[in-house]
């Protein structure tokens, strides 16, 4: 047994030595390789049989290597150049591989994100479907109306106060008596936290006929106790609307409308006296009404102290009569410190909205006083029965503004020369405030 083991060990050592020598010197040991493979081995070791295919592969590799080296020797380049080319080629391949890897990674990340978003959208859509489509529609509608609701709430919160009035109709005299009793909880429009309220009363659509209460100074709860009478036949009263507007008086600017109340006469039981409170509503802002234009000429002679005012013509006057025309005439007042010193007036022009006058009026004014006076020009509609209503008004003087001040300055800069200019008529109240005239 010991002898057999020693014999197998010797065979193994010989085989190992033979393979090593073949690797280093393959051509010198081709013949012995065949004898080694044909030796019988009793121990059953198949290591020599496994070496046969390995030796064939090595031969092929060696042949390819020899061919490659032969081809390299044929290339007319030095070895270092070939090595450099190989290194550059390897680097290029490496960079290409890195770029491809990065692109693949980026695509994977994008796909993951899109999948995540898709999942979220799916969840949201499920939530929407679960809540129901009708609910979404309702939410959209409520979203659109939220702004409107806020505006309505703001309007409701903005309280303008209230007014107490009375109505009484006399069927025998055909007249409506409107009583303005008091107002309460008015907003403060002045700097001191108060207001100077008064009330205007109209029986629309006729704005020509209006009444005004007295101004109650520095109060938010004024008491008026004033009555006004409108002579209206009962048959015509159904088409009328009573309007009561509360204003804040301001001596130096336009009066602000605090609020108003409108009463449709068709909804009022005139068989008995009515007395009630009503909340004031905000007045709708109306564009300024066009009253017409007037052309005047001014001439001043300093040495003689003589001012000549010529009323030339007017155009596009407001319609004041039922027939759509007016009977206009012009009043000229000479004022100083809000006091009327002298008064002149033109003739009446019947049934026209574009009257032509060419009438002159003279006033004696010393040169040292010319900067202290104002000339007020008022266009009125003549009425045989009732009061003559003012259509519009302007004034010129050193304290005027706009075209009126420019006209006055041109007159003083050009003594003895008549200077003519057109002026747009303004509401009577606005001009009276600017002049400081009393109500």
From Swiss-Prot:
UniProt keyword terms in alphabetical order: Calcium, Cytoplasmic vesicle, Glycoprotein, Membrane, Metal-binding, Repeat, Synapse, Transmembrane, Transmembrane helix
Glycosylated residues in this chain: 6, 46
C2 domain sequence ranges: 159-278, 290-423
Binding locations of Ca(2+) 5: 321, 381, 383, 389
InterPro entries with a match to the protein in the record: C2_dom (IPR000008), C2_domain_sf (IPR035892), Synaptotagmin (IPR001565)
Major subcellular location class: membrane
Cytoplasmic topological segments: 102-439
Protein family (similarity comment): Belongs to the synaptotagmin family.
Role according to the record: May have a regulatory role in the membrane interactions during trafficking of synaptic vesicles at the active zone of the synapse. It binds acidic phospholipids with a specificity that requires the presence of both an acidic head group and a diacyl backbone.
The protein's name: Synaptotagmin-B
Gene from which the chain derives: P65-B
């Amino acid at each position: 047994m010991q002898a057999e083991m020693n014999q197998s060990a010797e065979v193994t050592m010989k085989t190992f030595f033979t393979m090593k020598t073949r690797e280093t010197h393959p051509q010198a040991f081709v013949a012995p390789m065949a004898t080694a493979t044909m030796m019988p081995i009793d121990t059953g070791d198949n290591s020599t049989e496994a070496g046969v295919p390995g030796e064939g592969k090595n031969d092929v590799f060696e042949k390819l290597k020899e061919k490659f080296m032969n081809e390299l020797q044929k290339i007319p380049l030095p070895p270092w150049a070939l090595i450099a080319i190989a290194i550059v080629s390897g680097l290029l391949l490496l960079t290409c591989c890195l770029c491809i890897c990065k692109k693949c990674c980026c695509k994977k990340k994008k796909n993951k994100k899109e999948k995540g978003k898709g999942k979220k959208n799916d969840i949201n859509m499920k939530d929407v479907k679960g809540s129901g489509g009708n609910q979404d529609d309702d939410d959209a509608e409520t979203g659109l109306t939220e702004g409107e609701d806020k505006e309505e709430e703001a309007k409701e919160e903005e309280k303008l106060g209230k007014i107490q009035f009375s109505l009484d109709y006399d069927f025998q005299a055909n007249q409506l008596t409107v009583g303005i009793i008091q107002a309460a909880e008015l907003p403060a429009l002045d700097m001191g936290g108060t207001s100077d309220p008064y009330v205007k009363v109209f029986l629309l659509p006729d704005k020509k006929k209006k009444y005004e209460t007295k101004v109650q100074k520095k109060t938010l709860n004024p008491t008026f106790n004033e009555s006004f009478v409108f002579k209206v036949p009962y048959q015509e009263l159904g088409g009328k609307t009573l309007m009561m507007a509360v204003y804040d008086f301001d001596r130096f600017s336009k009066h602000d409308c605090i609020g108003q109340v409108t009463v449709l006469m068709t909804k009022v039981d005139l068989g008995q006296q009515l007395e009630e409170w009503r909340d004031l509503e905000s007045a709708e802002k109306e564009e300024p009404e066009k009253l017409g234009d007037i052309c005047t000429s001014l001439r001043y002679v300093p040495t003689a102290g003589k001012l000549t005012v010529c009323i030339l013509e007017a155009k596009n006057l407001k319609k004041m009569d039922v027939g759509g025309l007016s009977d206009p005439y012009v009043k000229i007042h000479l004022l100083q410190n809000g006091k009327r010193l002298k008064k002149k007036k033109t003739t009446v022009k019947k049934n026209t909205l574009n009257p032509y006058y060419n009438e002159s009026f003279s006033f004696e004014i010393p040169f040292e006083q010319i900067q202290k006076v104002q000339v007020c020009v008022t266009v009125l509609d003549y009425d045989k029965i009732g009061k003559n209503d003012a259509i519009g008004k302007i004034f010129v003087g050193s304290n005027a503004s706009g075209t009126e001040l420019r006209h006055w300055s041109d007159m003083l800069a050009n003594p003895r020369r008549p200077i003519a200019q057109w002026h747009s008529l303004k509401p009577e109240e606005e001009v009276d405030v600017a002049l400081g005239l009393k109500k």
